[in-house]
Amino acid sequence: MLHQPGMGIGYQPTAAMNNLLDFSKSKQAGIPISMVTCYDYWSARIISETPVDAVLVGDSASMVMHGFSSTVYAEVEMMAYHTAAVHRGLGGKFLIADLPF
């Protein structure tokens, strides 16, 4: 397992989050979840070995990965491309994808 900086002493990952119902139950119970943003296969492979609960493929990919000045340049095809790459590397973690602006 990878080092988990900033999670503090006594950090306990939440139970497996596999779908929207699990996400909703955690929210209703006041259980905090951890989520990171990811845009590519290799980063997803690394995240797959951590206790992170959920992964977001955000429209910020247009800025971070493609160098645009705004998220308005993200298109459905771009989001589908990055979401597919992350999905292939992520394994069974809960994956959330933004639709473009």
What kind of feature is each model-predicted range?
Residues 2-37:
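N-terminal amphipathic alpha-helix/helix-capping segment at the start of soluble metabolic enzymes
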Residues 11-21, 68-84:
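Active-site-adjacent beta->alpha loops and helix N-cap segments on the catalytic face
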Residues 36, 40, 47, 86:
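Conserved, mostly hydrophobic/aromatic
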Residues 37-38, 97-101:
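A cross-domain feature marking catalytic cores of carbohydrate-active enzymes
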Residues 43-44, 50-80, 99-101:
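Glycine-rich, proline-tolerant flexible connector loops at the mouths of alpha/beta enzymes
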Residues 48-49, 84-92:
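Acidic (Asp/Glu)-rich catalytic clusters
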